[in-house]
Each structure stands twice: as C-alpha cells, then as structure tokens.
Amino acid sequence: MAEHYFSQNGLTACCTDTTITLFWDKPAAAGAVETYTVLRNDAAVGTTVKTHFTLEHLQPETEYVLFVQWRGGGIGELTVRTTPVKHRLNVTAAPYFAVGDGKTLNTAALQKAMDDCKENECVYFPAGIYMTGALRLHSNMELYLDEGAVLQGTASRFEGTEMECYSSLLNLGTLDHTAGPNCENIILRGKGTIASGGRLLASRIIENERARLKEYLAQNADLVSTCENADTIPGRVRPRLVNMSNCRNIWMQGLTFANGASWNLHMVYSDQIVTDHCTIKSDGVWNGDGWDPDSSTNCTIFACEFCTGDDAVAIKSGKNPEGNIINRPTKHIRVFDCH
C-alpha cells in the first residue's frame, strides 16, 4: 500500500491522492497567537494561526517539498508523495448490492467488500443509511463515506471478543498485550457518519447481562453497593464504536463518529494513530467517551469537535491491577485545536 504517513524534521503529514494534511508542534518560544506560513516547492501557499494546514487540489503520485516557517525561523521541511488514485469498491454495486434504505441489514455484503479490498483500493459508501452488525477490517485498506452516507450499527448486541465485551461496530486488529502490531495502514475518511445503537443498544445489553448475572449480583450485593450505580457490572460488556487493538498507522479524517454504546474511538496497544477534522458525538450515553488511547503510543488528535456523554479524551494505560501487571504505559499523546 502506498505510504500515507510521513514524519521528519518536526513536521508530520497524512496524505491522499489530492490532499496533504500537515501538522507540527507549537514552538517553545511562540506566543499565544502566531502566524505560520506554509510553502510548497519553495512557493508560499497559505498562512495559518493554527499548528496544522491542509493542502488541496494536488496531483496523485507526485512529490511535494513542504516547509513551515514563522517569525522565529523555520519549523521544518518534509517531503511527501501523494498516493495513487484508488479503485473504489462501491458497496451498492455488484457483487455487493448493499442497500442504503435504513432498513436492510447489510452485514454480509459489507463484510465481503471489506474482505475483498486490496492495497490501493477503497470501500466506497455513497449517500444512504447502511444498517450493519459488527465488521472486521484488515491491514492496507480504506473506507470512504461520501456526504450523506451513514454506516449505522443496529441496536442488537454483536458477538463477543476476547476483551470480554461485545464486538464493536468496526473492529481493527486482534488484542494481544504481549505483541506488537498485527493490523496496520488503514484509513477511515470522508464526509459521512459511522454510528451505532447508542443508548438503546447499551440498555439492551445491560438488561441482558443483568438477567444472565442475576445469581452473581444477588450473591455479591455488598460489591454492587460500592459501584457507581446498579448498571456498572452488567454494563461492563458494552461495545465500543470503533476498536483498534494492536494497530499501527491508522488515520481517521473528516467523519462523524456517533453513539457508541460506551466509548467511541478506543485504541489499545496501538501506535501512530491520527484523528483530525472529525466530529465525535455521544450525548446522553453513559461512559460515552470520545477518544481513548489505552496503553498506546504516538496518538494525535486535532481539529475535532466533541459532544460526548462523558470524557472527550481519556488517556488510559490498562484497567485496575491488570494495567500495572501488563505495564504498557501510554506515551506521546498530542491533543490540540479541539473543542
């Protein structure tokens, strides 16, 4: 798969065939507000008071030399090569024939499109509401949701995973705290929405678990009394919206992520995750965190909007004693220009 991530000399960039999104750290000597000039092949292409800039209308498979300067001098120089134009696998066309009517369950058709997607191809969603259950992604692929496209998870629970919770709507990688990445180079982008069942899905899972754990809860009334509320223990198996386990080089851009049954974007034992120009919504969802790096490194989020039922960003390194035993700390997290 053509490289979409570049980082050197204080500059980092993620690119498509026609765009480059560039970001950098604010200089230590900078004031509250500074103006930065971005140059492409020695010609100024724009200024910004933010520490990121997007270049558009570029040519595919073309090398560009980028330079950022401010009143204190140069920030750095970075050479970026845009990707090839990707062949689109339209989920509504043959052989998938997914139906975006908000009613038809498309899980099998969409999973086939995911499985078929090769390097330098893209699973493409035109406008429509595509109902689906859990989907599993693999290395070296891209999802693109066009404006008006909604990948909508059902309000029914999905099968469980080794995380001892139900599957997320989108599942990337396989959890293994003893290993490095097993899933890499995935792009989720576009102008559409990835959404799940939110409060309804959460409540259905909690009630199902409450019935399943009836005897345990009765026998451990003292433990239950110390919890936040009566839903705490049965609510532990709620799925995420997007789960990234042992992933590397994942880029999420431009999308709206909405209504996970608990956390929305959760990356575990992962590295080099970039999220930008996204909207993350889970208003009214208990524990509805927005963006949670967990025992992960080099994760960056910027230019994003949050309206969440809990933390916008929550940085974690495991849970309870297990986090200390596994001992994989979260490092090098950058959060800027979000609100």
Predicted features and spans:
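Extracellular/periplasmic carbohydrate-active domains that bind, remodel
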Residues: 1-339
